[in-house]
Amino acid sequence: MRDRKITQENLYLILPGKVSRMAVMYAENFGVTISEALKRIYNSATYRKLEREDSKLWHYGPVALYEMLLEEL
């Protein structure tokens, strides 16, 4: 079995699932479209941290990440 580690080079593979769930929560809570929710998430400081492997935020689930996003706003 190969040692499978999350690195900066493969982190992009797990981000869409987390971000899409965050976007659904955001859209429902703020009454915006999914596209608008995605735009706000991708432009947030939370996402900038999430996309850096060394922040280790990728360990968090979408609910915890969403709560971090709300604290930022």
Q: Positions of the model-derived regions?
A:
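C-terminal alpha-helical interaction appendages
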Residues: 1-73
